[in-house]
């Protein structure tokens, strides 16, 4: 069973990715706040370089992997969406060739 991350793990991940991802804004909706009677905050990850939050995880994983195991020869992933875009972008930042496979639908 995996262990839960500690705050120091979150800080380390932030340090690994901060130069490679966009610092996206937190926004709110006055209409939704009024309807719910509470303040609701949204993290606008749609403004990220690849259009989703997945870039944060892909960048963190690849940087951590490279720090602990060295640069891989190639990255192979299976995805047809945001994960594929994130892996491809993160791989290109590190000059690692990336092969993305996607199923036909």
Per-region residue spans from a language model:
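PLP-dependent amino-acid enzyme catalytic core
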Residues: 1-105
């Amino acid at each position: 069973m995996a262990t839960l991350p500690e705050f120091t793990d979150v800080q380390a991940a932030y340090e690994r990715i901060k130069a490679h991802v966009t610092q996206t804004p937190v926004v709110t909706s006055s209409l939704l706040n009024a309807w719910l009677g509470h303040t609701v905050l949204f993290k606008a990850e749609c403004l990220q370089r690849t259009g989703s939050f997945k870039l944060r995880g892909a960048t963190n994983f690849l940087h951590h992997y490279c720090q602990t195991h060295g640069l891989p020869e190639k990255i192979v992933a299976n995805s047809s969406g945001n994960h594929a875009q994130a892996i491809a972008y993160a791989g290109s930042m590190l000059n690692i060739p990336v092969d993305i496979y996607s199923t036909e639908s």
